[in-house]
Amino acid sequence: MAGILEVCVDSLASAQAAIAGGADRLELCSALAVGGLTPYAELLQQIRAQSRIKIRCLIRPRAGDFLYTKDEILLMAAQIGNLKRLGADGFVIGCLTADGELDTAAMQPLLKAAEGTGLTL
């Protein structure tokens, strides 16, 4: 089984370099210096205008832990909907409980918003 070369990018230039280097898929982020945040919609549009490479967008509204409030979950679901409309092929998501377990209840609105796309947890 062949692997997939996914490259994390946060700019048009890094996306172009990844594509030229043979990437199969991009993980699109912003602010990699803080571990990555949700990318700007305009950056997705720029890349999509130049390439049909598969793009999964990180959904992370802030730096720090992965314990999200209900308002943050609603924001994340809205971000998924917007980026999905603009051509994202999938999303990279994750919510944790205070015990460090996957918070499946918190992730339900995100899974619903991302329906029909690829997911990385």
Locate the predicted segments by residue:
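Hydrophobic faces of well-ordered beta-strands that scaffold small-molecule active sites
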Residues: 3-7, 26-28, 47, 55-59, ...
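Active-site-adjacent beta->alpha loops and helix N-cap segments on the catalytic face
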Residues: 12-16, 20, 32-56, 70-78, ...
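Short acidic/histidine-rich motifs immediately flanking catalytic phosphotransfer sites
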Residues: 22-23, 87-88
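A short acidic, helix-capping loop that chelates divalent metal ions and anchors anionic groups
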Residues: 62-68
